Design a protein with these regions (language model features):
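Charge-dense, helix-prone N-terminal extensions
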Residues: 1-155
């Protein structure tokens, strides 16, 4: 009597990720890597600064120039904020919480870069206030506004 033939083991079908763009999936992967690195690292300022500057250096123009300038403004205005990356973009944290971040236009195919603030930022102004700002260029007026926003954000 012969044994019944075994069915060939089939690999489970690869699930297609729906709902997220390739850029969003890339950003989530970058964030997962950042979380792992933070867990392993001592989370010192030099490591965060290095990661933020590397993210800026990887950007194309004009985002690179905008990000360099925003980085300089934030670090001069609020030296207590620690530079790091957040979803692959330069960000600035108070303790473990991100206060503000720069998002390049090219990352998500938008026509402007973004300076954003999280709920940690103390920007509250009545019942409604902006938390993100489009950037296409920086002159003295925009730089002064960013300085004021960062000062207010850290309280």
């Amino acid at each position: 009597m012969s044994k019944p033939a075994k069915k060939a083991a089939s690999k489970p079908a690869k699930k297609e990720t729906k709902g997220f763009t390739a850029e969003e999936r890339e950003a989530m992967k970058a964030r997962a890597q950042e979380l792992k690195a933070e867990a392993r690292a001592s989370k010192n300022r030099a490591e965060g600064e290095s990661a933020a500057l590397a993210a800026i250096a990887a950007m194309k123009e004009p985002d690179r120039t905008l990000a360099k300038r925003v980085h300089a403004i934030v670090t001069e205005t609020a030296p207590g904020l620690v530079p790091k990356t957040w979803y692959g973009m330069p960000a600035y944290a108070q303790g473990e919480k991100i206060v503000c971040f720069f998002q390049s236009a090219q990352k998500f195919g938008t026509r402007y870069a973004t300076l954003g603030f999280t709920a940690t930022a103390k920007l509250d102004d009545g019942a409604m206030w902006p938390i993100a700002f489009a950037l296409t260029k920086l002159d003295a007026a925009e730089e002064a506004r960013i300085r004021a926003l960062v000062k207010q954000a850290v309280g």
